[in-house]
Amino acid sequence: GQGERQSATASGQPAGKVMGASGAPGGVQLIRLPNLGASDDTRADENNDSPRGKLLLDGSNVSRAVQDVRRSLGTDLTDRWELDDDANRGRFLLRPYKPMYISFMDWTTSLNGTPGTPNPLNTTDAGNASLANQGRRAETTFQISFKSKVAENLFGDNGDLWVGYTQRSMWQIYTQQLSRPFRETNYEPEVMAVFRTNYRLGGWHGRLASVSLNHHSNGRSLPLSRSWNRIIFQAGLERERWTLLLRPWWRIPENAKDDDNPDISNFYGRGEAVAIYRHGGHEWALTVRHSLRLNPSRGSVGLEHAFPISSYLKAHINLFHGYGASLIDYNHRQTRIGIGVSLTQWL
């Protein structure tokens, strides 16, 4: 079969197509909802023209209803990554990627006053302390993140090519005596090949698999330069209101002399898992990174909560503990708490 991207109703209409309802009141329309993750029994019902999957709705609410039902079926990944025809919006348009937020107050238990690495060229000390992280433990942090699809159906009716960009900045806005500098900014462009999947694993539905080439750097000169390149593999699974992203990666080796941070994998990690739960307009996201080594065992844990405060804006609270809050702090352990607003979330 052609998979979910090619799903259609038994009547020959594309999934989700709006059809007129004979005898229905003015403005009321009959729609058939997308056949997502349906069992064989469900498909049989549809072929027998069962009312399952049909709703009578006011025309102005059709789009919202389709979106709500898709989410209740566990299709957030399908919508965010445009994995079927109903979700497909075409190429060369900006789409949300990772959360976009601003934490007006982001407080840390410990500033990294003399950041360093095993490479002596990338280490600060008393002799160049003016180059080190300075300022207050409270700052403003914001992140922008977007992606765009540049090619579709690389392998038959599956496989899309995306480009993405994420930028996270830490702004010492409360440090007036230092002219409110940006303490750290991390840049993360990447190219991603994303494939639709359809399998079951312990009650979870595997929706996507991807592989990406990722560059991550802070754009600074020695001794504060930090950077690395990775190949990131990703599996995306869903279960009702839950979404799980499993993201192991492999660091592309560098020449030892030019390596800004040769031990970054032992602190920042060799992979991460992101568990997302959505309900009633709220979204909780738990991110766990780990070095995948037992001695020593290092990594981080982060928790985000976003909830509505207006029609288009959500409050955003985030907690972080461990290593890698930023690249300059990849080997500095700290606890952070941030409070602000978000425009987009993981899903």
Language-model features: locations:
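Residue-level detector of the transmembrane beta-barrel scaffold of outer-membrane proteins
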Residues: L93-T108, D160-G164, S210-S212, T243-R247, ...
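Transmembrane beta-strand segments that form the barrel wall of outer-membrane beta-barrel proteins
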Residues: G127-L131, Q167-S169, A209-G219, L244-I252, ...
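Outer-membrane beta-barrel "beta-signal"
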Residues: I317, R333-L347
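Residues that define the transmembrane beta-barrel architecture of outer-membrane proteins
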Residues: A138-I144, G159, R183-P189, R207, ...
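Residue-level signature of outer-membrane beta-barrel architecture
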Residues: S148-V150, A193-T197, H215, L237-R239, ...
